[in-house]
Amino acid sequence: MMKSNASPSESLSHHTPMMQQYLRLKAENPDILLFYRMGDFYELFYDDAKRASELLDISLTKRGASAGEPIPMAGVPFHAVEGYLAKLVQMGESVAICEQIGDPATSKGPVERKVVRIVTPGTVTDEALLSERVDNLIAAIYHHNGRFGYATMDITSGRFQLSEPQTEEEMAAELQRTSPRELLFPEDFSPVHLMASRQGNRRRPIWEFELDTAKQQLNQQFGTRDLVGFGVEQAKLGLCAAGCLIQYVKDTQRTALPHIRSLTWDRQDQSVILDAATRRNLELTHNLAGGTDNTLAEVLDHCATPMGSRMLKRWIHQPMRDNATLNQRLDAITELKETALYGELHPVLKQIGDIERILARLALRSARPRDLARLRHAMQQLPELHSVMSELKQPHLTELRTHAEPMDELCDLLERAIKENPPVVIRDGGVIADGYSAELDEWRDLANGATEFLERLEAEERDRHGIDTLKVGYNNVHGFYIQVSRGQSHLVPPHYVRRQTLKNAERYIIEELKQHEDKVLNSKSRALALEKQLWEELFDLLMPHLEQLQQLAASVAQLDVLQNLAERAENLEYCRPTLVQEAGIHIQGGRHPVVERVMNEPFIANPIELNPQRRMLIITGPNMGGKSTYMRQTALIALMAHIGSYVPAESASIGPLDRIFTRIGASDDLASGRSTFMVEMTETANILHNATRNSLVLMDEIGRGTSTYDGLSLAWASAEWLAKEIGAMTLFATHYFELTELPNVLPHLANVHLDAVEHGDGIAFMHAVQEGAASKSYGLAVAGLAGVPKPVIKNARAKLQQLELLSSQPAETRKPSRVDIANQLSLIPEPSAVEQALAGVDPDQLTPRQALDMLYQLKKLL
């Protein structure tokens, strides 16, 4: 915006009336772009124009002068505005849309204008601005005494949730899970690093996060006296965030939010917790490069509807612990799979489409004619859907069927009210169906020229005056007229008033035709005004059905997810997992759900056995041998079981899980100034602090980012801590062969390896998991595969032989001048002299004197 040191009244007085109006509206929306409607364009001025010019790559011009200065200006055509808005929203920008609401014909001075909507990344509902199969969330974050309050809303579905992460790690995981398009935070928010590199961050006044203000806002939204009924009364920090969020959404939408009906507490103890690193490493919905190819969601998501696809992704990102709900889902999938009804459901559901987002636009009264046409089409599918579902017996599926009952009254209303193929917008009419309103039909007939009246008038005038060439016509210049050929013009009566002379004819007007013309011209505007009124009344008629429609959308989305998982289970040969109460993971013939889909050759299935007596597997084997794939597939199978899906295995028995941790791969975090090793150690520290006996931990190549001794020491100590202090179910892949000694000194550990076979200078990876430690690492063979020059490989092989020879010699025979590279640090503690002395003593055979002597001997050995 233009900057000035003068007071607002002083500075405005120097501007033209139109710019005064603009500056007043801009002052009400100082932090966002203002699209100011002028005729067929939306214009931006001053700093907004400069910013829009850069972001949208549009021309920056100047508009005359105001207050003695040229005004920077940029604009976009009104008919193309949605494309520009989509681009800005993708960049995290917010835009206020200012429309002309006054009549230019009657306005004295500038036409009255008003901001009619504010488009923000987290509150958009227009189809053109949304990703069809991804949730579009807005969130608010609050921080107090090291703890957080967090609230999210999906305005396109009405879901409104809060949570209270206890640590920065938990908060970071929540931000990654929910990926809000817009994030509100208080002005005094201190852990700003949590929001680094995020688009759409919005600073809000501190008072908007006050608890009393928040409760007042929420009670006002829900029409309640308190929040006890929602079970969120004790979540004070979460409520602070939720209050700010609901106020912001109301302010931007400029209307009521009738579809936001409840607030739920998203408790961590109900979910299998995945931290940010785990979501990234397991490539659930995004791969490591940031795309969506080759992810778990890509493999599992063949949903018929966008709302089903979005629900499936929510399930994937929030696996649950409640076995009753999971078995309910599995029972439903089993019936759909065994009856093959998924094949009949899919095409019907596809016809229903994305009614969830249509309902949000309906609630906000921003639905367009084609939204209601699509809603009508969805309603028309319900009888067939209900018929297909009538064959289902499983209780959860029959419950879903009750929420998908045909809505005949609503369907009939939409069939009567909306034309078969309505235009995109109501602006020019043509939306309300013929026959819905007798008054509208009458005005439309007039607007279309009322051909019956004209035909009758033409016949009467022709017969009355005996003029057989007489006919009634219309053109845009002269309106309605009576045309008579020049040869019969002498028969025209005196009350005919000549309007136009042509070469071979004369055109006349009579009072009766003039009255009709006035009525017709007036009828077009009357018909359009009445149609817009009927359109608004239609919203009022639909609103009482909103809650039932939302239940329908939720049930159809869930049915879609279940039929989709049934189809995936059948076509990808998945098995039903057994969820048990005993700790452990037992998988036979497990496969990686993503890798097996992209491989050209058959995937080698592998078993895994983790139980209270076998809590940690030390995994060794060559690089590229499949260690990381084996670990990831175990985590993905466990995760899929905890969303209630069939899994890629011959059989699977999965015990209770509270968290899944992964420490797999790493790269420099340049934005935060952290090295590869620092990233690795930060993730390791998070695991060692937060893992429990019911956690599944994946540790891959710990310690490789530092020196050999440091790395080996850290890897050994981390494995020992996980085994002795935590007892978590752990897959620990390592290239430090010294760690294969751990199962010999600690209980509940075992060695497994992935083998390979060398032939000449080449190597064949077997990808099969076998018991015991690997015999060698095959590092040189892998280097050869990678294209390392043969002379380098040959030299490395010679050095390897020297090192192996060195390590086999007794230490005292080695030349002191040679660097002792091969003498690796032994991490298995040798017995001390005291321990050796005590080992040979039988306390029961010692006399008091002998015991005293032994004590003095031990003292000397210390």
UniProtKB/Swiss-Prot annotation:
GO biological process, one term: mismatch repair
Keyword DNA damage: yes
Keyword presence, DNA repair: yes
Regions that span the bilayer: none
Binding site for ATP: 621-628
UniProt xrefs under Gene3D superfamilies: 1.10.1420.10, 6.10.140.430, DNA repair protein MutS, domain I, MutS, connector domain, P-loop containing nucleotide triphosphate hydrolases
GO molecular function: ATP binding; ATP-dependent DNA damage sensor activity; damaged DNA binding; mismatched DNA binding
Keyword annotations of the record: ATP-binding, DNA damage, DNA repair, DNA-binding, Nucleotide-binding
Superkingdom of source: Bacteria
Family: Belongs to the DNA mismatch repair MutS family.
Stated role: This protein is involved in the repair of mismatches in DNA. It is possible that it carries out the mismatch recognition step. This protein has a weak ATPase activity.
Official protein name in the record: DNA mismatch repair protein MutS
Organism: Vibrio cholerae serotype O1 (strain ATCC 39315 / El Tor Inaba N16961)
